[in-house]
């Protein structure tokens, strides 16, 4: 009888460990969302003079028309969903918008300020940290970099190495969801450079190389494009009054997955961490049930337009994907 019992227990254990592990949820826990968006609006005559010691000096940096719309509305969509589901959350917007920002503001998105804001977070291991970036990205020696602002010159002449960003996010010490809308953003995974195009449909692409096992927390990374693709701004929203609004191809569809409704007449206001108010054009129509990054990736991949011409979204994660929105 004892042999039979242990045999049954062993079989049950095998069945259990062979099943997919449920997605982690953050119900009852705190969510901190950091939104970084840059429009690269020229601010002075020599704004694009490029110091020769910076890697991005050989790249063309043009103004982006959709990044601020993307940043404000994605943040508002998350904030609205968390509020609806009674999830404790904090919103941190780091935006470089227009031709006269406050360069002295600690939320101005220089590379130093971004890392400093992340490093100052005090979260528990069961909390969730969501990081979103909308801006220019470039590759140099197989490394991904983001072009950030410089407060001393009021220009764009600093760069943030993706691996440094990942180190900072890992050190927060909790589960994290990283969403990047930038050219070549799939380069977050060094293996991706050898991944055939036909494999990008896999929902189980494993993101391991950039994970420091010292921490061991769950991390999901959703990238707008593969390592060798640009991230386009061709998602145009037309309003009834004839006005229009530009979004990134990736974030436009990301907002759709979050049931965001674009509107000029009905806006959403979100309080930033410094007490200022961020106004987004539109509102959330609500999300029934939970929404994981796996769910979002599947929707983005299935709804991509002209897949041979536009970019492919890419998803990496350690062990399990993460619920961006909880069930209730």
Where are the regions a protein language model picked out?
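Caspase-like (clan CD) cysteine peptidase catalytic core
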Residues: 111-134, 138-191, 296
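Active-site-proximal C-terminal subdomain of hydrolase catalytic domains
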Residues: 176-308
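Positively charged n-region of N-terminal signal peptides that target proteins for export
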Residues: 1-4
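Bacterial N-terminal signal peptides
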Residues: 8-16
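Soluble non-cytosolic domains of exported or imported proteins
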Residues: 61-72, 105-112, 155-163, 241-249, ...
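Boundary/activation segment at the start of structured domains
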Residues: 19-145, 235-238, 317-328
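Sec-exported extracytoplasmic/periplasmic mature domains
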Residues: 76-84, 119-123, 170-174, 184, ...
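Solvent-exposed, polar/charged alpha-helical surfaces in well-ordered, non-transmembrane soluble domains
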Residues: 69-76, 80, 112-119, 163, ...
């Amino acid at each position: 009888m004892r042999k039979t019992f242990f045999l049954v227990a062993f079989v049950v254990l095998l069945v259990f460990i062979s099943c997919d592990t449920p997605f982690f949820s953050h119900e009852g826990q705190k969510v901190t969302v950091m939104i970084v968006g840059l429009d690269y609006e020229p601010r002075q005559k020599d704004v694009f003079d490029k110091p020769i010691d910076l890697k991005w000096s050989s790249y063309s940096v043009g103004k982006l028309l959709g990044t601020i719309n993307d940043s404000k509305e994605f943040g508002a969509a998350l904030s609205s969903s968390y509020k609806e589901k009674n999830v404790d959350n904090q919103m941190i917007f780091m935006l470089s918008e227009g031709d006269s920002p406050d360069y002295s503001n600690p939320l101005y998105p220089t590379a130093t300020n971004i890392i400093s804001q992340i490093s100052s977070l005090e979260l528990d291991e069961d909390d969730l940290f969501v990081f979103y970036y909308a801006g220019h990205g470039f590759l140099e020696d197989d490394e991904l970099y983001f072009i950030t602002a410089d407060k001393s010159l009021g220009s764009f002449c600093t760069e943030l190495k993706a691996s440094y960003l990942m180190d900072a996010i890992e050190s927060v010490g909790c589960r994290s969801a990283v969403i990047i809308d930038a050219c070549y953003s799939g380069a977050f995974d060094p293996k991706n450079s050898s991944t055939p195009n036909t494999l990008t449909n896999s929902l189980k692409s494993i993101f391991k190389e950039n994970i420091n096992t010292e921490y061991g927390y769950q991390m999901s990374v959703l990238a707008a494009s593969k390592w060798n693709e640009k991230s386009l701004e061709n998602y145009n929203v037309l309003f009834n009054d004839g006005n229009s609004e530009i979004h990134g191809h990736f974030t436009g569809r990301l907002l759709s997955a979050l049931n965001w409704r674009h509107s000029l007449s009905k806006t959403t206001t979100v309080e930033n961490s410094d007490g200022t108010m961020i106004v987004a054009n539109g509102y959330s129509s609500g999300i029934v049930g939970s929404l994981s990054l796996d769910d979002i990736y599947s929707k983005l991949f299935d709804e991509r337009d002209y897949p041979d011409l536009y970019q492919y979204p890419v998803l990496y994660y350690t062990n399990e994907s993460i619920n961006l929105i909880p069930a209730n």
